[in-house]
Amino acid sequence: MGGQPQLPGTDGVGGIEPLGVSSTPLVTGGRALEQRSGASNSNSMNSSNCFQFPSVLLTNANHVLNKLDELYCIVSDRRADIICITESWLDSATPDALCMIGDYSIYRKDRLSGPGGGVLCYVSTAIQSYVVSPVVSASSEFEILWVLLRPRVLPRPLSCIVLAVLYVPPWYNVELSRALRSYILSCVDFFRTKYSHPSFIICGDFNSFDTDFCYKLLHFKQM
């Protein structure tokens, strides 16, 4: 679309039992949004022939510890740069060592109260990455993990990719929907101020949460 960088190899899957992925980019329960870069330099866009955004694999695990063997097989087959998992069902009693994958850094946001929920993210060690925390308060009713990615090569003028992995519970209400909408808008504004020309990937299990504002106000596009 107009020479904008694309996000190939993005798989979105929700409500899967057992763990699995689909070749279809979007299905019910899984979405990935990528910011339009707005770059107009034709030379830099032509160079996109030798550049690809990191590939992203998204799945809803419903207890990842019970499906690690399946996860290892999928990772070996797909070789995605980034693996995003919702409903990880991990808690503070679960050490990272139990769910590590070779050649990937692991990041997680566990549910603080009650069973279920939680998000988990694996990033290839070939990509510099670390957790970032926006100075914006978030409701404990949803889990969201922010990770900054600095691939070795990015098309100009992008300086980094801000990845968000989000899980919205199915019982969310109008009040929570408004709070989440406000939170995402504030976080994107925060990161745009903090970093020069960041690109964004927001993915996860949104359930019935309406993401239209991402397209209308933030100029994201659904992949």
List the model feature ranges, each with a label.
Residues 1-223:
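A shared catalytic/ligand-binding motif for oxyanion handling
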